[in-house]
Amino acid sequence: MPAMSHQQRKLTTAAIVVLAATLVGIGPGRSEEKGPPVEFWKGHFARDAQAFHDWDNVKEIPAVCSRCHGADKVPEYLKEGKNTPAQHVKNGFACTNCHADLLTYERYNVPKVTFPGGFTIDSGHNDTNLCMTCHQGRESTASVNKAIAGLALDTPDTKLNFLHVHYFPAGATRYGTEAKVAYEYENKTYVGRFAHMPNVSTCTGCHQPHTGEVKIDRCGGCHDGINTVADLANIRMSTRGDFDGNGKEEGLAREIANLQDQLYAAIQTYSANVGGTPIAFTKAAFPYWYADTNRNGRIDPEEMKMANKYMAYTPRLLQAVFNYTFSVRDPGGAYHNGRYVLQLLYDSLESLAASGKAGVNMSGKVRP
């Protein structure tokens, strides 16, 4: 190997110094402009998170998962359009998963993002496109329609299986019908991208990129009384109406939570009346929706097994379950695009009500 020039040695030394300073959160590489020190136990660096360890008992992280669950597989996806399997992850994402240059902190160039249903979006902001490369979901209106094609709307079919939109599909929520990741009912109109104020119109405008934590101080500039994450539930935006039908207009997060509760109850009632066995949801284990064999309204440990996964889906039930799951998988949905989430929940309830088997009363509810 030829000897390095003086200039090459200087650049190499500088790179090592900056990288070391970055890793320990000190030195010139961690200036005010570069943000706070990296916290290696949160968000993208949550080394013990299940998102990085679900495959510890198998040889490698499968190619279909490695883009977003490998340590540094995003660059491979951006270059090749697909991934190879990844090695097990020890410390969350590597810095090079998002940063193309560790001296300048430049991120990879992402001109556009293709969502699961085939729709392509350019947010106009490179870092947002980079975030949406993973935060987009894995199923869509198209995949649900493909699964239920040709089937009677209210007839159980054991060939139907739960379709999981996946975790934190915030990009899909924000772009609404432009991405069509949630299930959109035929002959219904849905909102597209939620256009927020300029300083909070990007992913990193609202979230610390390493930890995902919300920049609460940005919210309080326009919304009075917002000092903590809990206060966010009071934000109403400009949307008017009593969406959940409880007789009062509340913060969008509360309206959404109430509609989620109503939809979940309707799903359970419909499943019992049409499928013969009620369905219930748990976040604890895939595929999350199981048969509630003892009819106590929840999934107990002995029910949480693949042999007990719910197998009496009708097309109507699958649609509603998909949208309920979408709404809970994006805990920030009220702020990413609250109107879109409310439309999904309302339409899912309305569909179940039309069956006459879900015990749903739509009176008093308003569709945004």
Task: Locate each region found by the language model.
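Bacterial N-terminal signal peptides that target proteins for export
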Residues: M4-A15
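Bacterial N-terminal signal peptides
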Residues: A14-L23
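Sequence context of c-type cytochrome heme-c attachment sites
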Residues: G27-Q208, R367
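Mature extracytoplasmic or organellar-lumen-exposed domains after removal of signal/transit peptides
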Residues: P37-W41, A230-A233, G241-P368
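Short, solvent-exposed secondary-structure capping/transition elements
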Residues: E76-L78, R107, S143, V214-K215, ...
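Divalent metal-coordination and catalytic microenvironments
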Residues: L130, C222, S348
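Short, well-ordered loop/turn and helix-capping segments at boundaries between secondary-structure elements
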Residues: Q136, S140, D224-T228, A354
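Structured mid-domain segments that build the active-site/substrate or prosthetic-cofactor binding neighborhood
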Residues: P198-S238
